[in-house]
Amino acid sequence: MTDNFEIKKKILDKIKQYDRIIITRHFRPDGDAIGSTKGLAGILKLSFPQKEVYVLNEDSSQYLAFLGGEDAPIDDEKYADALVIVCDTATTDRISNKKYALGKELIKIDHHIDVKPYGDLSWVDEERSSLCEMIADFWLTFKDELKIDDEAATCIFTGMVTDSGRFKFSSVDGDTMRRAAALLDVGINTEWIYSNLNLDDFDVFKFEAYVYKKMKISKNGVAYIYVDKAMQKKFKLTNEQASNVVSYL
């Protein structure tokens, strides 16, 4: 496994060239999408206080609201001389902020299969358990230049936790745990993080039980279930809660 130092250095150099940086991610965000964008933004704001750094998207997450809200929209003309960084998004059709193309240059940072490459610079590592792990790696690689605080570290750790199945998935390795440990050393409150991640209302618990009872297993061992509008209405689910069904399977 390579450490991707060359592309990471190119990304840092590109960040240094711009006074305005806009960070976005995929729509219907999960913990990794929210954590990576907010965590990266936090690092850049601390490291380069003279720069304008925005996290701009067209949707939000109630489940992950404890990590903070979205930034207010900015005027379209401010994109023209901005660097846009897209996190955790394999293809451009899934980018939440549709104004991303107005930026002067585009960087893609992702850990999904690179089926449709895009961006002036692209750092894709399919072996990583989460995009947040890659952001932690980016910070640690340039630790002498990049600063972090407990707020940014909390966002990044949350994304690592949620995308790795609480560090249970096979994509987790020693590097994953070492990066998580570095975030812990910043001084984050893991008890607070896990308590917020476990705050589901009773309707969600009933839906989860229903999914486990009704899901099907294909001949190839793939678990699946259909979630339609009627089911969503029955359990009083938001679109975000309904789409989270994949995490139960």
Model regions: which residues?
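An acidic intrinsically disordered interaction segment
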Residues: 1-9, 93-95, 99-106, 127-135
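Glycine-rich, phosphate-binding/catalytic loops in enzymes
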Residues: 39-41, 101-104, 124-125, 178
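Active-site cofactor/cluster-binding pocket
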Residues: 62-121
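Short beta-strand segments
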Residues: 24, 85-88, 110, 159, ...
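Short, motif-level signal for alpha-helix interfacial/capping segments enriched in acidic residues
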Residues: 3-10, 88, 140-143
